[in-house]
């Protein structure tokens, strides 16, 4: 065989091909903890150089973009709430890597990374934060309400996305689509009643939904241990099978979702997946994040479990990429984010007229009551208004 056991990087053993060492490699994930499953995802994870570079670029872009978002908030350019994804990048990037055309995702308010991965350039995300007309939703959504193709947001209410994701999965089954809906929430939202109502319906009708708990350890300022009688969130579904995955390992996350998709596509119904991750910042920008945990705890995670540093060490050690290649990637990311920050400062703000757009999905026929000219104005879409204002 041309496969041999390479060095251990963090908790992962590198298995490399002697013949293809520079273009592909295999790593081992931490064991997946299972609930009501006879077997789970394979711990052996294969990755090509092309994919490795893409995942690194995406994670690093999200990290730098969120740093820029935090700085814009401190400059008082961002109004309202602002929840950053720093530390959790491997979750979104790994999940997106496993998704196929037609698959959907829906999350809560920590949505900047998902918006970027769903097709919005960094500039669109940052311009949305500063209320610019060039933002993801023309400056009207702000930090918590951003969207993309098959990405349903961005929801500002804790747990509100859980029944919505279940509904998206219901539509997929009704239309006989071979797709899944990834429904994301944090550990703090696992105690919300709508999660259990949703899981009951999903299991009753065997819906293709993956309930994913991004367990970053804290719901606002409350640790998981103080808020939950059981912190094994992957077992919360009771009659819904589930498993635990290391959410700081982008390849393990990808492996988990690929396996989950196969489960759903086989008609077996929902799964509950817990991704163990960590957020470096506070719950939001108004939370310093150090009153309920120590700075030493944060630094320890950065030092031993950081998703970007850990992945970088793996792929460099395996010979997939060089330090110089990654430095070039970092350089390009800096340029992109710096240019986006300038746009977020200087692009036109959304005008007051935009408040009247997107009130309804489409324009009703004239014979409908109350469709006077002033009411019809409310049926204009943001896109139509943007085009008119750009003339």
From Swiss-Prot:
The kind of enzyme this is, by top-level EC class, is oxidoreductase
Keyword Phosphoprotein found: yes
Q: Where does thiamine diphosphate bind?
A: 109-110, 156, 158, 187-189, 216, 283
Q: Which reaction is recorded as catalysed by this protein?
A: N(6)-[(R)-lipoyl]-L-lysyl-[protein] + pyruvate + H(+) = N(6)-[(R)-S(8)-acetyldihydrolipoyl]-L-lysyl-[protein] + CO2
List the coiled-coil residues: none
Task: Give the UniProt keywords, A-Z.
Answer: Carbohydrate metabolism, Glucose metabolism, Magnesium, Metal-binding, Mitochondrion, Oxidoreductase, Phosphoprotein, Pyruvate, Thiamine pyrophosphate, Transit peptide, Tricarboxylic acid cycle
Record text on activity regulation = Pyruvate dehydrogenase activity is inhibited by phosphorylation of PDHA2; it is reactivated by dephosphorylation.
* Intracellular or extracellular location(s): Mitochondrion matrix
Gene3D superfamilies found in the cross-reference section: 3.40.50.970
Which residues bind Mg(2+) per the record? 187, 216, 218
Q: Where in the sequence is Phosphoserine found?
A: 284, 291
Name recorded for this polypeptide: Pyruvate dehydrogenase E1 component subunit alpha type II, mitochondrial
């Amino acid at each position: 065989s041309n496969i041999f056991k390479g060095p251990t990087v963090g908790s992962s053993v590198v298995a490399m091909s002697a013949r293809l060492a520079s273009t592909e490699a295999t790593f081992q994930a931490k064991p997946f903890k299972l609930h009501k499953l006879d077997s789970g995802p394979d711990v052996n994870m294969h990755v090509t150089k092309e994919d490795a570079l893409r995942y690194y670029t995406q994670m690093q872009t999200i990290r730098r973009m969120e740093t820029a978002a935090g700085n814009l908030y401190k400059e008082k350019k961002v109004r309202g709430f602002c929840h950053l994804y720093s530390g959790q990048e491997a979750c979104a990037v790994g999940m997106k890597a496993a998704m196929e055309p037609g698959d959907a995702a829906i999350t809560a308010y920590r949505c900047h990374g998902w918006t970027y991965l769903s097709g919005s350039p960094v500039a669109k995300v940052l311009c949305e934060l500063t209320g610019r007309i060039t933002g993801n939703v023309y400056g009207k959504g702000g930090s918590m309400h951003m969207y993309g193709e098959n990405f349903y947001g961005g929801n500002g209410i804790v747990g509100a996305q859980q029944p919505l994701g279940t509904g998206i999965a219901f539509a997929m089954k009704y239309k006989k689509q071979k797709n899944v809906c990834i429904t994301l929430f944090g550990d703090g939202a696992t105690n919300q009643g709508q999660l259990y109502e949703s899981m009951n319906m999903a299991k009753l009708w065997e819906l293709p939904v993956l309930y994913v708990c991004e367990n970053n350890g804290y719901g606002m300022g409350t640790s998981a241990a103080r808020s939950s009688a059981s912190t094994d969130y992957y077992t919360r579904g009771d009659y819904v099978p589930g498993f635990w995955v290391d959410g700081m390992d982008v390849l393990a996350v990808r492996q988990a979702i690929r396996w989950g998709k196969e489960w759903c596509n086989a008609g077996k119904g929902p799964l509950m997946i817990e991704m163990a991750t960590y957020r470096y910042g506070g719950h939001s920008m108004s939370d310093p994040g150090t009153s309920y945990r120590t700075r030493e705890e944060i630094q320890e995670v950065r030092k031993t479990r950081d998703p970007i540093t850990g992945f970088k060490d793996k792929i460099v050690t395996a010979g997939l990429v060089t330090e110089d290649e990654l430095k070039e990637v970092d350089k390009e990311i800096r340029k992109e984010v710096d240019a986006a920050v300038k746009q977020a400062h200087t692009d036109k703000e959304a005008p007051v007229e935009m408040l009247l757009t997107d009130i309804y999905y489409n324009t009703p026929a004239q014979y409908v009551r109350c469709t006077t000219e002033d009411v019809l104005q409310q049926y204009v879409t943001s896109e139509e208004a943007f085009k008119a204002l750009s003339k």
